[in-house]
Amino acid sequence: DELGLEFDDVGITGYPEGHPFISDATLAEHMQKKAPHATYLATQLCYDADTILEWIARIRDERDVDLPVQIGVPGVMNYAKLLSISREVGVGDSLKFLQKTQGIVDFIKQFIGSRGKYTPDDLVEGLAPHYDDERYNIGGLHMYTFNQVPDTESWRTDMLAKHR
């Protein structure tokens, strides 16, 4: 009240692929301590729906954390920038992910066909069947735009139109 501001929601972070400098045990301990004081959990960006869903299942089962999850999704951006950012923030093995998308030949076709831009279609569509599943309690998507707001907004608008 002294600040004249109210905080309706307070989030804590989660790392579906772990953290490059913090052990999983430490992450688990701190999540369990903070969860009772939070209203949602926001994840670090991750590129793989299965990794995210498995992680959510683990925090539900092993840590008894049932907060709604805002899933961190990388926005639309040039692959080179995406690789650079992913390395900086320590997210998985970025190159492996980008090549794993569908194998190296399909990756090259996708890279050329996309004009060198990553879009999170596969990730979002991989999560979509679980949006209404109470076990996962997906509260929404948190788009990491990395200053690529117009491209990401255009993608978002197209994705919504496609699925209406």
Question: Model regions: which residues?
Answer:
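Active-site-adjacent beta->alpha loops and helix N-cap segments on the catalytic face
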Residues: 1-2, 21-25, 45-61, 148-158
